[in-house]
Amino acid sequence: MDQFECINVADAHQKLQEKEAVLVDIRDPQSFAMGHAAQAFHLTNDTLGAFMRDNDFDTPVMVMCYHGNSSKGAAQYLLQQGYDVVYSIDGGFEAWQRQFPAEVAYGA
């Protein structure tokens, strides 16, 4: 895949439930601590190395940000690092929280 794909929160949720992809959240630490998708990995400059060590490059990665804009740049970056399939989640955490309020976790 040369280009990331945009995906809506319903499709992202389904991929997560079926263990077809991993979810990363690129928001700042304070926003992440105030609420994030329960299965999200907090991807920062400091955690990128650990994420890349622990996740195979052929595992699809879904990127979540605030509203679905910043995730596009991060998705492109992950493709450039060698990940085969990367998605940017349209609507970001705001849409996720609205659609799946029971699947929001709190804390770091």
From Swiss-Prot:
Coiled-coil residue windows: none
GO MF annotation, one: thiosulfate-cyanide sulfurtransferase activity
EC class of the enzyme, as a word: transferase
Source taxon at top rank: Bacteria
Role noted for this protein: Transferase that catalyzes the transfer of sulfur from thiosulfate to thiophilic acceptors such as cyanide or dithiols. May function in a CysM-independent thiosulfate assimilation pathway by catalyzing the conversion of thiosulfate to sulfite, which can then be used for L-cysteine biosynthesis.
Family: Belongs to the GlpE family.
Name of the protein: Thiosulfate sulfurtransferase GlpE
Provenance organism: Escherichia coli O1:K1 / APEC
Highest classification ranks of the organism: Bacteria, Pseudomonadati, Pseudomonadota, Gammaproteobacteria, Enterobacterales
Gene expressing this chain: glpE
